[in-house]
From Swiss-Prot:
Matches recorded under NCBIfam families: rpoZ (TIGR00690)
Keywords tagged on the record: DNA-directed RNA polymerase, Nucleotidyltransferase, Transcription, Transferase
Primary enzyme class: transferase
Species this protein is from: Clostridium botulinum (strain Eklund 17B / Type B)
Name of the molecule in the record: DNA-directed RNA polymerase subunit omega
GO biological process: DNA-templated transcription
Length: 66
């Protein structure tokens, strides 16, 4: 079994968004935008849309608006 750490951690992400539900909504919507052709707003080593979206949230590039 692989015990790899998720980076950034869920705790760090929740300080930026507030709750898990909002985090899921925000990252999934942003990942969908990237899948549909939107340019990534940050440089990451991954080509996975969800990983890019999570890093954008972590870097405060994409923010949750109520």
């Amino acid at each position: 079994m692989n015990n790899s750490m998720i980076n950034p951690s869920i705790v760090d992400l929740l300080t930026k968004v507030g709750d898990r539900y909002s985090l899921v909504i925000l990252t999934s919507k942003r990942a969908r935008e990237i899948i549909e052709g939107a340019e990534p707003l940050t440089k990451v080593d991954s080509h996975k849309p969800l990983t890019i979206a999570i890093n954008e949230v972590n870097e405060d590039i994409v923010k949750y608006e109520e």
